[in-house]
Amino acid sequence: MRFSDNLAKILDKYENLGNKLSSGIMGDEFVKASKEYAELEDVVAKIKEYNKAKSELEEANNFKLEVGLDNATLEMIEDEIHTLENSLPKLERAVKIALLPKDDADSKSAIIEVRAGSGGEEAALFAAVLFNMYQRYAELKGWRFEILAISDTGIGGYKEASASIKGKDVFSKLKFESGVHRVQRVPETESQGRIHTSAATVAVLPEAEEVDIQIEDKDLRIDTYRASGAGGQHVNTTDSAVRITHIPTGITVALQDEKSQHKNKAKALKILRARIYEEERRKKEQERADSRRGQVGSGDRSERIRTYNFPQGRVSDHRINLTLYKIDEVVKNGQLDEFVEALIADDEAKKLLGIYSKNTA
């Protein structure tokens, strides 16, 4: 089917859905039609803009052929034709991107987990820096950042930390943060001024609701124990800490941040549900990605994705070869949008290339 025919079908479907909604349908039929109609609004707006530019270009070319036009009018028409010819490829690409299959999880909130990697205490300090960076970014975006658990080292570092980030399309913005982040800087304890390299890993999971993942009580093993602080000392005398294991998958979550066992259990279940949902997503995505290497969801988190070089004041994303020389704005102020938008654009380009290659093979 030709591209233009496909667009015409979408416009017809949108119009039919609009007529259907105006006809007085009710109940589940109305809910289903409303959802479909809303999902098409963005792509329909882009199709109409694209078709309008095509129509205007055709009219301008026809007008140019008319006899008796003066030079000033011809020059004006040629300028318009030049402008329209330049805009059409961009408008067509915008339509194609809008038509790309959507990740069902993109609209969801997210759970972010940061863990210290290689590098000892310096890695733990860097993990804390990353965690705070994401908190600043969430504040800039107007999202709600709720700390779920922090395992600190006692001197400002985090062995691991997790948070729930609630808002519209959070996962679509943060999903490319998953991977190994590397830092290069001179530790405060380094007397010789030598640069040390350490790392932390970030995992971003779509926050799953109960409707997304049904967890049976019989599939859970719940252990309780006394919470411990830094150095292993017990910080309270009740069994408030909780460890929940999902028996079918072997996924385990342990939480001890709250003094209440009930609160620890609720938070642990939230993280567990997200991890199970992400595991199922990755399996399905892997099946789809077998024929398009390099797509999000390939399951490879071992690759270093970004380096934060403090002496040079730069942050480099190795996946898209983007380097920004404003490390304080990124790390301290959470200004991540340049990376986020570039990564989204790169992902869209790869998907378009995959579809094009598939259709022309």
Swiss-Prot record:
Question: Among the entry's GO cellular component annotations, what is one?
Answer: cytoplasm
Where it sits in the cell: the answer is:
Cytoplasm
Looking up SMART domains in the UniProt record yields:
PCRF (SM00937)
SUPFAM superfamilies with a match to the protein in the record:
Release factor
Which UniProt keywords are present, listed alphabetically?
Cytoplasm, Methylation, Protein biosynthesis
Which InterPro entries has this protein been placed in?
A: PCRF (IPR005139), Pep_chain_release_fac_I (IPR000352), Pep_chain_release_fac_I_sf (IPR045853), Prokaryotic/Mito_RF (IPR050057), RF-1 (IPR004373)
Carrying N5-methylglutamine, the residues are Q233
What is this protein's function per UniProt?
Peptide chain release factor 1 directs the termination of translation in response to the peptide chain termination codons UAG and UAA.
HAMAP family xrefs: Rel_fac_1
Which family is this protein grouped under? Answer: Belongs to the prokaryotic/mitochondrial release factor family.
Q: What name does this protein carry?
A: Peptide chain release factor 1
From which organism does this entry originate? Rickettsia massiliae (strain Mtu5)
